[in-house]
Structure formats: C-alpha cells, structure tokens
Amino acid sequence: MPKIKTLQAASKRFKITALGKYKYKHANMRHILTKKSTKHKRHLRQKSILPKIYLTTIMKYLPYI
C-alpha cells in the first residue's frame, strides 16, 4: 500500500503540541489594522488551539505528524 502524502499547506499552518493538540495562528493580522482595536489585535497575536470539530479533517491532512 502506498504512503499517504502530507498536505503541505496544512503542515505549514498547524503545529502539534506536547499533549497532542493542534495550535494555529489567527487570521486578520496582515493589513487594514488601523480600524481594529488594540485589544482585538492583541488577542489575534496569540496562538489558539484547534477545535475538536476540525480535528478529524486535519488529521487526514497530516498523517505522519
């Protein structure tokens, strides 16, 4: 049986933690930042844990990670 290829776009966007959870960076921090509040931008800077509903999809994309 052939090996399953890893989706490279997903491997660049998601990292696995020591407990086996997936963390990712928030969107909306590239441009048009003047209209966003400081509090909103501060919360977007932090990494977040992937919700369980997306876990099976991401695990298909990253079979060996």
UniProtKB/Swiss-Prot annotation:
Coiled-coil segments: none
Gene Ontology MF annotations: structural constituent of ribosome
Gene Ontology CC terms: cytosolic large ribosomal subunit
GO biological process, one term: translation
Keywords noted in UniProt: Ribonucleoprotein, Ribosomal protein
InterPro entries: Ribosomal_bL35, Ribosomal_bL35-like, Ribosomal_bL35_CS, Ribosomal_bL35_sf
Domain of life: Bacteria
NCBIfam families: rpmI_bact
PANTHER family, A to Z: 54S RIBOSOMAL PROTEIN BL35M (PTHR33343), LARGE RIBOSOMAL SUBUNIT PROTEIN BL35M (PTHR33343:SF1)
Protein family per UniProt: Belongs to the bacterial ribosomal protein bL35 family.
Name the UniProt record assigns to this protein: Large ribosomal subunit protein bL35
Species the sequence originates in: Blochmanniella pennsylvanica (strain BPEN)
Gene: rpmI
